[in-house]
UniProtKB/Swiss-Prot annotation:
Gene behind the chain: GAL11
Lineage: Eukaryota, Fungi, Dikarya, Ascomycota, Saccharomycotina
Polar residues bias: start-end ranges: 738-764, 772-802, 998-1020
Family annotation (Pfam families): Gal11_ABD1 (PF18535), KIX_2 (PF16987), Med15_fungi (PF05397)
Keywords (A to Z) from UniProt: Activator, Nucleus, Transcription, Transcription regulation
Descriptive protein name: Mediator of RNA polymerase II transcription subunit 15
Biased composition (Basic and acidic residues): 962-971
Organism: Kluyveromyces lactis (strain ATCC 8585 / CBS 2359 / DSM 70799 / NBRC 1267 / NRRL Y-1140 / WM37)
Annotated function: Component of the Mediator complex, a coactivator involved in the regulated transcription of nearly all RNA polymerase II-dependent genes. Mediator functions as a bridge to convey information from gene-specific regulatory proteins to the basal RNA polymerase II transcription machinery. Mediator is recruited to promoters by direct interactions with regulatory proteins and serves as a scaffold for the assembly of a functional preinitiation complex with RNA polymerase II and the general transcription factors. Required for transcription of genes encoding galactose-metabolizing enzymes.
Gene Ontology biological process terms from the UniProt entry: regulation of transcription by RNA polymerase II
Main location group: nucleus
Subunit structure, as described in the record: Component of the Mediator complex.
Disordered: annotated span: 101-124, 138-183, 281-315, 413-497, 655-682, 712-804, 951-1020
Compositional bias of kind Low complexity: 101-123, 138-149, 157-183, 281-312, 413-441, 459-490, 655-675
GO-annotated cellular components: mediator complex
Length: 1034
């Protein structure tokens, strides 16, 4: 087996190792940026370890090369993705820098406006250097913050070094308090601590920390797993507090900048304003200022979230896959560990001591989500990326909100600019609002008060279109969210809601299924690595399908009202869960073909449920259209019209079927007879539980469409009064392939002998009009028969299958061939000591003589008889019993007769062949009744009647003695035979009582006896019946 390793040279292996190490080094440079710290030798060692493990584990050269190439390609694609991510980060950083520049330009414009009005502020007794100093401080902090954000975006780390806060000038107003973080900012700070990467300077202070851990949740998990010392925990706690302080300082700086912005945007009024105007401006409510501050804080927080999003995305929500990764016992352990974690955090003061049950449950869910995510990473399960469609829509909404807030901020900034403009400057035209106020003052009227959030004031008539066109374009480009929600609701399919009775019935069925779990054996050692990988990949690829079908179980019960269907689906679900739970641990219970069959069943259930929901929606839409076309119609009129249409469809389908007219008339005369279910062919579903066979349910209902290859062209079936017979022979022939998997399954082939009879289960009562499936009590029986796709109400009429008869003939031929082979095998086993019984029994089948009319010539040995009839003391093994159950015939020996009736047909099957085929073996004869052969004459016990001196070999003639030993007795070449001319006796092949000629009668046609050569013509081969040429010459 190691010959293939000699074909790979060390140079090729070293080349693979070099490629892997180079890719790892490139990825380290890309992710680390300028401060990337990696050792090429270590990377090369890790690449060598991977290559050596792969070299030792592979079974062939092709597997080794394929796995190595796939690994290199995957790493290369990951490198390309990292490069693309870095490009996006650079583009975002450039965009942020441009935004900061635009903001600085706006602030410079404001500063220019402030300098123009500084002389007037000094006239009022306000020092001019206050606003200038605040503006300079703001500019410096904005530059530092922009540089810090660009540097953190390029290096992949955020806020590695705390920037020193600029000292506040002593000339600020005395009433400005030291800014504090709000409750919302504190909560946001705690959330950022969970997802923000820890700077390398802080990580290096934590002792014994393995590489690759960069966040606090990872450190918490590592500490719970490795149990560090108390000294290490104290150092880690100090590092955590230091990291928290750094983030707190950055938040305080941001709040400082926000407060400065608000103070800059509220300058004093000019000297030439009247006292009333100054009073009105001083009487602006403080609520307006607080609203502006909150809006600016929210805007900056959202910008920071957007900046952090490409680097630190929130972990994806994978808690729904908890059952797929952990068992029930492990889930309980995780729950207890989450409780202990909350207690430890409360003791250390990181969480408040008085948490209610909902808050505790939220923290436990987050902890379990982290554990599921890590487990999925360890097992190699694909993890859904957080950039889903919902998050993209949220990002778009946030961007729209940002744009709206920016526009509001610009409008709010324009208000103080207009108020700051001196009225005596000839270069700037006065606003219309101020002109109106001056006119009212001249007329002795009161000035209009300033209304908070009153809208955008018009500084100039030329600027009006620019301020209005932007929100108008945004409103036209993005539809309102209410219309989008309505469109989404219209596109969704309406699902009927189960009642309390339905849920109770489902719980009862689930309890019945869980009482009898499926017992599967561990076949991990019998599977190859490729088969195991196939099972894993198939289970991972169809997880969404499994969860979708499980969520459809109540809906399926609402549509079918059949407990047997739901019971089988619950069995499949229980089987799938067990297979997936064990496969995650590396234990495999079934083969890949069984997984394919389970997936096939899930797909059929999903397609069936989806199709029925679509039909239900179409039915509701037709009813609405009819009501819209004729609003005077009542609900009963709509139901009656719909029933007429459905009856016409059913009549067309019934006319296309080949049924007896009295049966059709009887069905049409009793339209209100309730039929509770459908009994389809039972040999098509999976027998997942051995308890089902033990209980011997008669009339087990299964979905016929699960095995139908023409599922896409489903049409309603017409009820047939004849019950469909089970076909165990077909199940035995088609189920042999899966005998080793531990689950007897059936091949998914269509069964066209489906019939419609009353179901064993009782149908729950349904309120009339609650569902389109059951609109009125006067529905025809054909409409209430079956929930399957072939008997739905609004199904199109069935089209005749032109190949139906051919398919039935092929099925019967296959069953007949299987029975014929089984009969031949049993005859070889029973008649192992009796060749004549083997010939006569086979010949009786050719002549259409039944088994009960053929007596055996030799008595069957007692051990064989006990084994066949099952009368012996030794019981059959499981394998023998399984083979007997799958046998298409039932074998027994009764009254010295071998009986082998068919399991698929009660009547005895005919294996007769034409008489011409029998006589073809004997060409000169037209009828086997006239076939007469020369039998071997009877001889005495002592055959040596000749003189010993004449024919007996002497002592010296050893050659004669050796030749005589080779001669067979009773053969034509035996020298010790009587004279063949003395006794000439013929015997017919068939007894005379059957119409054959007797021994003394002459045949009507020349027989072989009449054409016999003379006795002295011993050299003629015409008499040698042992020679095949004799039969060929006839």
């Amino acid at each position: 087996m190691d010959d293939w390793r000699s074909t790979i040279s060390t140079q090729e292996r070293s080349q693979f190792v070099t490629e892997l190490a180079q890719i790892l080094a490139d990825m380290s440079r890309i992710n680390g940026g300028e401060k990337a710290n990696f050792n090429l030798e270590k990377l090369k060692k890790s690449a060598e370890q991977f290559e050596s493990s792969l070299y030792a584990s592979c079974n062939s050269k092709d597997l080794y090369l394929d796995a190595m190439r796939k690994r290199i390609a995957a790493m290369d694609s990951a490198k390309r993705k990292s490069i693309e991510a870095q490009r996006q980060k650079l583009a975002q950083a450039q965009a942020q820098a441009q935004a900061v520049q635009r903001q600085q330009q706006q602030q410079q414009q404001q500063h220019h406006m402030q300098q123009q009005g500084s002389g007037q502020q000094q006239a009022n007794g306000i020092p001019a250097n206050i606003n200038a100093q605040m503006f300079l401080n703001q500019q410096a902090q904005a530059r530092q913050q922009a540089q810090r954000q660009i540097r953190s975006t390029l290096t992949g780390q955020q806020q590695q070094q705390p920037m020193p806060q600029q000292p506040q000038p002593q000339q600020q107003q005395p009433n400005m308090m030291r800014p504090q973080l709000t409750l919302q900012q504190q909560q946001q700070l705690a959330n950022e601590l969970k997802v923000t990467e820890i700077p390398r300077e802080l990580l290096q202070k934590i002792p014994n920390l393995p590489p690759g851990i960069t966040t606090w949740p990872q450190i918490t998990f590592w500490a719970q797993k490795n149990r560090p010392s108390q000294n290490d925990l104290i150092i880690t706690k100090k590092v955590y507090q230091l990291h928290q302080q750094l983030l707190n300082k950055s938040k305080l700086q941001q709040s400082n900048v926000n407060r400065m912005n608000t103070s800059v945007q509220q300058p004093g009024m000019g000297v030439q304003q009247s006292p009333n105007q100054r009073m009105n401006m001083n009487q602006v409510p403080q609520q307006q200022q607080q609203v502006r501050q909150q809006q600016q804080q929210q805007q900056q927080q959202q910008q920071q979230q957007h900046k952090q999003q490409p680097q630190h995305q929130e972990p994806p929500a994978v808690l729904g896959r908890l059952n797929q990764v952990f068992t029930q016992a492990e889930q309980k352990m995780l729950y207890e560990a989450g409780k202990k974690m909350i207690e430890n955090l409360q003791r250390s003061g990181k969480l408040p001591p008085n948490l209610d049950s909902q808050q505790q449950l939220l923290y436990i869910k987050k902890y379990m989500n982290q554990m599921v995510l890590k487990k999925m990473q360890q097992l190699g399960i694909p993890i859904p990326m957080p950039g889903s469609a919902q998050q993209q829509s949220q990002l778009l909404q946030q961007q729209q909100q940002q744009q709206q807030q920016q526009q509001q901020q610009q409008r709010q900034q324009q208000i103080p600019q207009v108020q700051q403009a001196p009225l005596q400057q000839p270069q700037v035209q006065p606003p219309q609002s101020q002109q109106a106020q001056s006119r009212r003052q001249a007329m002795g009227m009161k000035p209009t008060p300033v209304i908070p959030n009153a809208g955008v004031m018009k500084p100039q008539p030329q600027q009006t279109p620019q301020n209005i066109q932007q929100p108008m374009m945004q409103q036209q480009s993005s539809p309102p969210p209410q219309q989008q929600q309505q469109q989404q609701q219209q596109s969704k399919i309406s699902v009927p809601r189960p009642t309390e009775q339905d849920m109770l019935a489902l719980k009862k069925l689930n309890a019945e299924v869980t009482k009898n779990p499926v017992k599967l054996n561990d076949i991990t050692n019998r599977l190859t690595n490729d088969q195991k990988q196939q099972i894993r990949s198939k289970l991972h690829a169809n997880q969404q399908l499994f969860s979708s079908v499980e969520s459809f179980i109540p809906t399926l019960y609402m549509l079918t009202r059949n407990e047997e269907h739901i019971r089988q689906l619950l069995q499949i679900r229980m089987l799938t869960r067990e297979i997936m739970e064990k496969a995650v641990r590396g234990v495999f219970l079934v083969e890949p073909n069984v997984v394919d069959k389970v997936i096939f069943r899930y797909q059929k259930y999903y397609e069936y449920t989806k199709e029925q929901l679509l039909r239900r929606q179409q039915q509701l839409m037709t009813m609405r259209q009819m009501q819209n076309n004729n609003p005077n119609l009542t609900a009963n009129d709509l139901l009656n019209q719909q029933q007429l249409l459905q009856n016409r469809k059913l009549n067309l389908a019934m006319q296309s079927q080949t049924q007896e007219p009295p049966q059709i008339a009887a069905q049409q005369q009793q339209p209100q007879q309730p039929i509770s279910g459908v009994n389809n062919n039972s040999n098509m579903g999976i027998v997942l539980d051995s308890s089902l066979n033990a209980t011997s349910r008669s009339g087990t209902n299964t979905m016929e469409f699960l095995n139908s290859p023409e599922f896409s062209a489903i049409s309603p079936a017409v009820p047939s009064p004849n019950k469909d017979k089970k076909n165990p022979a077909t199940r035995a022939v088609k189920g042999k392939k899966n005998s080793q998997s531990g689950i007897p399954t059936s091949n998914p082939q269509s069964n066209s002998n489906a019939s419609v009879v009353n179901s064993r289960t009782a149908t729950p009562t349904v309120i009339p009009g609650s569902s389109p499936m059951f609109n009125n009590k006067s529905l025809a029986s054909g409409q209430q028969n079956s929930p399957s796709p072939k008997t739905m109400i609004n199904s199109p009429p069935q089209q005749d299958n032109p190949y139906k008869n051919d398919e039935l003939a092929l099925k019967k031929m296959a069953i007949r061939t299987a029975e014929l082979m089984s009969r031949y095998k049993h005859r070889k086993e029973v008649f192992v000591m009796s060749s004549i019984d083997l010939f006569l029994s086979t010949f009786a089948d050719c002549l259409d003589i039944k088994d009960d009319a053929v007596d055996l010539v030799h008595k069957t040995p007692q051990p064989i008889l006990d084994q066949i009839n099952g009368t012996g003391k030794k019981k059959l093994s499981k394998a023998a019993q399984k083979a007997r159950d799958q046998d298409p015939v039932e074998i027994s020996v009764r009254n010295n007769k071998l009986l082998m009736p068919s399991k698929s047909e009660k009547t005895l099957r005919s294996f007769k062949i034409p008489i011409a085929d029998i006589t073809a073996c004997f060409k000169p004869f037209a009828d086997p009744k006239q076939l007469i052969l020369n039998s071997t004459p009877k001889h005495d016990e002592k055959k040596r009647k000749f003189d010993d001196l004449e024919i007996s070999p002497t002592d010296s003639s050893s050659e004669l003695m050796s030749e005589s030993k080779k001669v067979k007795f009773d053969s034509p070449d035996d020298m010790f035979l009587n004279d063949p001319s003395s006794v000439q006796e013929t015997k017919p092949l068939v007894p005379s009582e059957l119409g054959m000629y007797s021994i003394n009668s002459k045949p009507s046609i020349p027989s072989s006896a009449g054409n016999m050569p003379a006795p002295n013509e011993s050299t003629d081969s015409g008499m040698n019946i042992w020679d095949w040429n004799y039969w060929e010459s006839l």
